[in-house]
Amino acid sequence: TMLGPVQKAWLKRELKASIAPFKVIAAGGGWSSAENEDGGDSWGVYLTERNEIFDFIRDEAIEGVVLISGDSHMGELNCIPRSGQGGYDLYDLCSSPLAQMPAAKHTRQTPEMRVRDTWTRTVNVGVMHFRMRGDTPTLSYTLHDVLGEAVWEPLVLTPDDLKNGVRSWDRLADPLELERLERFKQGKGYYGYDPGPDWPNRPYYDAE
């Protein structure tokens, strides 16, 4: 278990009680299945418990949940599609490192869905901007490089994107990432070349 029964009960209770349009759950390690190496410390190693939390969010109709994480040694913007299972698509906003060298390990990884290409050129920081005035609150997320420049087009979410039955991942993903996903679904390498025999086995995650 990643959380243990006391922390998990607290998390579920606070999520259910919150009336905020956006509810941010922060974790030290990534939420996607990408980093599921043996002995790892991300949620990719604790998928049963992770999915229990995601099922709770769906079953209790808790809207507006967004995930943030770090410690992947590269900038990422991933999605765990849950709309095909009666929930909604959960976005993992991941920035790192800030004080170490980045690691180009993305070629060995395939999360459920990449929304933007990984950033491994420089240290980086993620910036979340909430606009709560007006009729439609928005959350925007961008990743910035060592010079403070944005490296992606921002991801912009509204509360309507984060409610049961709403599918948004393919609408918000970069076309390049959708192309890579289609290639992966056909049994080919996600990044255009076949994985090595010693690479972790990560079958296509069917978001339908």
Q: Where are the regions a protein language model picked out?
A:
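Long, structured stretches of catalytic cores involved in phosphate-ester chemistry, encompassing
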Residues: 1-207
